[in-house]
Swiss-Prot record:
GO terms for molecular function: DNA binding; DNA-binding transcription factor activity. GO terms for biological process: negative regulation of DNA-templated transcription; response to heat. Disruption phenotype: In cells lacking this gene the expression of mngA and mngB increases by 9-fold and 23-fold, respectively. Represses mngA and mngB. Regulates its own expression. SMART domains: HTH_GNTR (SM00345), UTRA (SM00866). Pfam families: GntR, UTRA. It comes from Escherichia coli (strain K12). Induction: Induced by mannosyl-D-glycerate. InterPro entries: Bact_HTH_transcr_reg (IPR050679), Chorismate_lyase_/UTRA_dom_sf (IPR028978), Tscrpt_reg_HTH_GntR (IPR000524), UTRA (IPR011663), WH-like_DNA-bd_sf (IPR036388), WH_DNA-bd_sf (IPR036390). SUPFAM superfamilies: Chorismate lyase-like (SSF64288), Winged helix' DNA-binding domain (SSF46785). It comes from the Bacteria. Residues 4-72 form the HTH gntR-type domain. This is Mannosyl-D-glycerate transport/metabolism system repressor MngR. Residues 32-51 bind DNA.
Length: 240
């Protein structure tokens, strides 16, 4: 197979298959055993080749699922208020949510301020992981006024929150005030997003408003930066 180390030759072959379109973004690679047989090498050599391609952001390894050709990062346009499902709708991929917490809690002083509610009001507290296929993409924690959504269900939060608000509740969403914060992931974030605790992530803190001025949610979203790119268009103000 030439003078290059075997693992680099295997990595080159896989890279060529991707370039020719034989392997497409999102495609699963054969198992390590199958690659061993195909190339006539040891499992250690196969793992070295795959690890190199993962480090080069060509492949991605999903724990408990396998190794895949890495898909293009999701473009998160800060000026477009769209749901997780809407951001991925043009890619025709499976998206789903795993709900970890679904409960009603009293509103402390902080939540009263963020949601513009009274001490007597209670709120929904929901935590969920958002997936593209089997890949955890984001960890979302949301608080919503119970008075606005007394009929919110676990099933709604397994799907699209915005679809429920707009299509079922017939409410009109106006805007979201957002703040993007770089931070180091907590142990929980690292575990749920399947990333290293030494890898920086981005957290989006937002407050959503209905067209009548009521706040319908306060949320915190932690994003795996391998899967997202944040874009905005800045126009220079004329000095005339």
């Amino acid at each position: 197979m030439g003078h290059k180390p075997l693992y680099r030759q295997i990595a080159d072959r896989i890279r060529e298959q991707i370039a020719r379109g034989e392997l497409k973004p999102g495609d699963a690679l054969p198992t390590e055993s199958a690659l061993q047989t195909e190339f006539g090498v040891s499992r250690v050599t196969v793992r070295q080749a795959l690890r190199q391609l993962v480090e080069q952001q060509i492949l991605e390894s999903i724990q408990g699922s396998g190794t895949y050709v890495k898909e293009e990062r999701v473009n998160y346009d800060i000026f477009q208020l769209t749901s997780f499902d809407e951001k991925l709708s043009d890619r025709h991929v499976d998206t789903h949510s795993e709900v970890l917490i679904f409960e009603v809690i009293p509103a402390d002083d902080f939540l009263q301020q963020q949601l513009q509610i009274t001490p007597q009001d209670r709120v929904w507290h929901v935590k969920r992981v958002r997936y593209r296929k089997q890949k955890p993409m984001a960890l979302e924690e949301t608080w919503m006024p119970l008075a606005l959504f007394p009929d919110l269900t676990w099933q709604v939060m397994e799907n699209s929150k915005y679809h429920f608000i707009e299509e079922v509740k017939k409410m009109v969403i106006d805007r979201s005030e957002q703040e993007i914060i770089p931070l180091m992931p907590t142990e929980e974030m690292s575990r749920l997003l399947n990333i290293s605790q030494t890898k920086p992530i981005l957290e989006k803190v937002s407050r959503g408003y209905l067209v009548d001025g009521r706040v319908f949610e306060y949320s915190r979203n932690a994003f795996n930066t391998d899967d997202y790119k944040f874009t905005l268009i800045a126009q220079r103000k004329s000095s005339r």
